Amino acid sequence: TNLKSEKKLPNILSSSYINKLLDELPFQTTKEIRDKAILELMYSSGLRVSEVANLKIQNFKLNKSIKVLGKGSKERVLPITARAGKSISSYLKVARIELANNKSHDYMFLGIRGGQLSEREIRRIVNLRVGTFPHSLRHTFATHLLEGGADLRVVQELLGHNDPTTTQIYTHVSKKQLKEKFKQSHPRG
C-alpha cells in the first residue's frame, strides 16, 4: 500500500487555558521569573525554541517589539503583548542580573550557571510549566490569531514562513467555528 502518512498537528491550547496558566505561573524565584518571561514571549510572538535561545538583550525594545533571527538567518521584528513586555522587563531588572552572576553575556535568557540557556533547557521549561511541547505554543499562537480574525498573510509574516503553504497547516478551524462562520456568512445560514 502507498498510504501517505499525515503529519500529526501539535496540540492547541484553548485561550482560556493558556491565559489561566500564564496568569497563575509562580513568579517568586529567579528561575520562575525567567520561565514566565520565556513562556509569555513564546505565546505572545510564536517563537521557535531556537529563536528564544538565541535572543540577544539588544533585540528587545522595551514593551514594544523583539528582533528575531529565524530560520535561514531571516530577521524579523515582532510586536509583543504588554504582558510579555512586562514579564521580560521584570526578568531583565532582577532575575537576569542574578543569573548572569557577574558574567558578561548578551543572550537574553540565561541558565543557572550564567551562560546561554540551551534549547534543551527551554524545551524542559515548556514541558514542566505547560505540560506540552514548545511547538504547541507556536501552533496555539497562530491558531488564536487566525481565530481572532488575523489574515493568513499576517500570520505567515509573524511566524517567519517563506511559503504560505507552510502557514496553511494552522488554518484547521474547529468544527464549532466552522458552523459559526457558516451561519454568519451564508445568506440562508
Language-model-detected regions and their locations in the chain:
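Conserved catalytic core of the tyrosine transesterase superfamily
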Residues: 1-189
